[in-house]
Amino acid sequence: TILLESGTDVAFSATKQNGGVIHPGYDPHPGTLKAKLNPPGARMYPRLSKELGFKILHTGTLVVAYSDQDLKKVDELMDNARINGVEKVERLDFEQLHNREPHISDKALGALLANTTVMVDPFEVAIAFMENAMQNGVELGLCQKVRKIEKRAEEDFVVYTQDRQYETRFIVNAAGVHADDVAAMA
């Protein structure tokens, strides 16, 4: 098993620029794949941080409402959270919000508080996952940009990079912002 990385290191592209907020899942529209996968994925991070040795900050998230329209949006997000199975989400009124955050603007009317939001260093997380994969037998091919994927037999593929080719039965496309381009090659 090999992981092909187009950059000079893992997390070389979009990952290193990610903000590192692990969203608990109140944003995705219920019924979507993201709504199904986001909450359980987010709940995995405390365990993964212990197992793989990366730092995690339990920050929580406030979505603050400054208008009646914003309050409606907060209520929609609360509904999403309930339907999507997000735990420890609260609707704060004016008084609760200002008691929690005394320096917030008096124009703030209320908020959604998601207590399970955590933050990570995306580069550190990517390195931890790659180190774990390598400890479990995965090779890392750096500077290996996929140029072409050819389907050979019923279950075989050949993946071409700029200077090598790899024969495989399975391809896991984790190309980030370039995932659509790689998928179109298969």
Task: Please place each PLM-identified region on the residue numbering.
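Short beta-to-alpha linker loops that shape the active-site pocket of alpha/beta-hydrolase fold enzymes
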Residues: 7-9, 97, 129
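Glycine-rich FAD pyrophosphate-binding loop
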Residues: 1-17
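Short, intrinsically disordered, charge-balanced linker/junction segments flanking boundaries
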Residues: 1-2, 179-186
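Helical element adjacent to the flavin cofactor pocket in flavoenzyme catalytic cores
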Residues: 111-170, 174-181
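Short loop/edge segments at beta-strand edges and connector loops
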Residues: 5, 58, 93-94, 142-144, ...
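Dinucleotide-binding Rossmann-like beta1-alpha1 core, especially the glycine-rich loop
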Residues: 20-100, 109
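Hydrophobic anchor at the start of a short beta-strand
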Residues: 1, 88-89, 171
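Short amphipathic alpha-helical segments
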Residues: 15-16, 76, 183-186
